[in-house]
Amino acid sequence: MRFLLALALVACTRAPADPPLPTDITLKTGDQHAIRGLTVTFVGVKEDSRCPDNARCVWAGNAAVELRIEGGADSAAITLNSGVEPKSIGVQGLRFTIASLLPTPVIGAPAPASHDLTLHVEATR
C-alpha cells in the first residue's frame, strides 16, 4: 500500500511531457505556454484588418499579433501576420504559424478586449 502511495505521489510531481509535433497551442491575450524549453506569450493584437464576418471584401486582410518568445537568457518580441509576411517564424528548432485568431471582426462591433490565438507549432529540423 505504501508503495502505491509513493508511486502516485511521484507520478503527480512530474512535469507534463511536451506534446508530439506538429501541434497547436491556443492562448488568450496575455497567456503564456511552455514548449520545448521556450515560453511563448501572446502579448496582443497589433493590427486586425481582416474582412469582417458580415462584409464582402476583395482582400482577406491581415491580422498582426505580437508574441514574446523566451528561452534561457534570450527573449524576443516577434510579430506574426495572417495575410502578409512574416507568416511564420523559426526559433530554436520550432516553427510558429498563426492557425487562427478569434473573434473575427464584425462591422459595427467594438474591438474585443481579448482574443484567442491558435498557433501551429512544428519542428524545423
Listing of model-derived features with the role each one plays in the protein:
Residues D31, R36-L38, G61-V65, Q92-L94, ...:
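Envelope-exposed proteins and targeting segments
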